[in-house]
């Protein structure tokens, strides 16, 4: 491998491993959970950071990976049963703070998958923020 090729490969590796950002919002460590071959839904998780001076809000999510993509959370009902529900109001990312989209909490929910989420695949996702606007990211599918 020539020195020029090595430098180019290194530069591309660094560029593709940088967090995605738009304005004050940065998205770090996104991943989707691998699904079974017959699964019709899946989920993605990531860390959202707001380096700005004002709160922002994640208000929507889109992807061609499923017929419907929403921001969901888990909550406990009166009988102590955990249920998933759509976060219609979105999720606030506080100024100078962060918000985790994580298992057992807020997360991106894919319903009506176009294809199974297979280990090693990548999913294109666009996050819509109230202030920062659209942030397009690539979400790797992992068995984490």
Go through each PLM region and give its residues.
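Bacterial N-terminal signal peptides
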Residues: 7-17
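Positively charged n-region of N-terminal signal peptides that target proteins for export
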Residues: 1-5
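Compact, glycine-rich, soluble single-domain proteins
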Residues: 23-144
């Amino acid at each position: 491998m020539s020195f020029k090729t090595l430098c180019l490969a290194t530069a591309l590796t660094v560029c593709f491993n940088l967090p995605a950002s738009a304005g004050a919002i940065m998205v770090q460590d996104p991943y989707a959970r691998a699904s079974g071959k017959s699964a019709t839904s899946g989920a993605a998780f990531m860390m959202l950071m707001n380096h700005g001076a004002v709160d922002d809000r994640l208000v929507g999510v889109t992807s061609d990976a499923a017929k419907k993509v929403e921001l969901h959370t888990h909550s406990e009902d009166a009988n102590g049963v955990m249920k998933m529900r759509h976060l219609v109001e979105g999720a606030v990312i506080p100024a100078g703070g962060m918000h985790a989209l994580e298992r057992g909490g807020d997360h991106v929910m894919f319903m009506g998958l176009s294809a199974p989420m297979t280990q090693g695949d990548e999913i294109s996702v666009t996050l819509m923020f109230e202030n920062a606007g659209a942030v397009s990211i690539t979400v790797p599918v992992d068995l984490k």
